[in-house]
Structure formats: C-alpha cells, structure tokens
Amino acid sequence: MAMLARKEHERRLESGELETNWVQFDEIETFEHTKFRPISVALAVRAKTGEIIEVQAAPFRTRVEQHVPLKYKGEYRPDHRSVAIEDCMLSIKKAARSEVNLVIESDESTHYAKTIKRVLPKSRYRQLTSPRVKNQKDHDPLFMINHICSRLRHDLSRMSRKTWVTTKLMERLQMHLDLFIAYQNGYRLSA
C-alpha cells in the first residue's frame, strides 16, 4: 500500500497537481529503536493548503557521544540529513510554478541554505522565527509546517516521543510516512 501511495504522489508531482509558489520546510527528529540511533525527517509543505510535497527520513549521528552506552559505542552512524534535504528540494523544484517566484520559508536552522542555493538558485529563501510566547494575538509565520509536524507526531504512533511503539527499521518509517502523505493530501488508493 505504501508503494501505491508513493507512486500516486510521484504522479501528482509530475502532473503539476501540487504546483505552488510558497513552500514551508522543516525537519523533525525521531529515533530508530533507541534514542542513540536518531532519525531526521525532512518535510516540505504547501504553505496555503497544507498539502505535503515531500517527506524523507534519514539517519544522523548522536549529538552527545560520551553518553552513548557501550553496546552502541562502536556503531558507526552515517549522517544523511543533507541527502534527505536535497531530495525534498528536488521535489519542491518539481512542484514549483516558476523558480523565480518560488518562496521557501523555514526556521533558523543553518543546514538548509547551502542546499537551497545549490538546487534552487533563483528562489527566495526566508528564515523565520515562531513566537516564543503563545498568546492568541501572536501570529505564527510557520503555522502550517508546525501544524503538519504536530499532526505527524499525533497521527503516527511511531513518531511519538515516548512510546512503546518505536521504529525498528527506517525503511518501514519511510513507508509509514508515504501513507501519511496519501492520507494528508486526500489521495484515493485502489489496490
């Protein structure tokens, strides 16, 4: 079913059904079986409609090597976040009406700017901050991506921070994310 969802999503990207000029991009973190095997999930969303353009999971190294238990000490963990970000940017390029008018918004992470300039050199890239204090009067400029990220954490049990249901294989997480794309974008899948 996940393969059907991915094929349908690719078809809609190629046909131009997800065309946009305004994209929001972010990453969320989860883990594979244990917190010492972190996974980054790169996410690109149409800012007006909330439709998902791309979701890619990739492993990365733990930040604090000294606190890793002995059984994970010798384990090499590659950092493929940049590959996931580049895959998302290539999907954004497919969905862009025109690269000149494309606006990409994200949080203040320093990982995104180089990849955006390399893959989408003519697009405009804006780094925004969400308000720290949550008042009703405050406007969150990254509301749509933050909303989709929170729905992802809520709707997918394996994305929850503290849970009995954890991801054992990153490939299965990617399949689950592909199904979430189909659900969020309203695709009708027939087996």
Residue map of PLM features:
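Residue-level recognition of single "structural anchor" positions
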Residues: 1-191
